[in-house]
Amino acid sequence: MSDKELVTQFFMEGYQNKNYGFVLQCLSENYIDHSPAGARSNQEAVNILIAVSKMFSDMQITIADIFSENGMVATRVRYKAIHTGECMGIAATGRSISFEALENFKVVNGKIVESWGYWPDKEIEALLK
């Protein structure tokens, strides 16, 4: 599996299909998450995905852009979901929301070893209000 295929499957299985066992297989033992949520372990990374799935149901993922060079994979991802659980202190609204996020990954020997993510929190908060 190429680095781009690995990252694409990570998104599809983790966010859309909730296949958390697959996500754990994608991550190296020493995985580091540099995003603001900053998972400190592989299980914590899965716990973040589980929390997101409780906030947003019917998650649909579209990889808008994906580039890979020298073990780095850069993505622009479109998310579409229904707000079904508390998020940022805002109770579930039942609204359908869409937003884009940027995620970068370092892949070594077929495993994700590091990631950097940016989700537009202010935009998401505005969509929920």
Tell me what each language-model feature is.
Residues 1-129:
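C-terminal and inter-domain tail/linker signature
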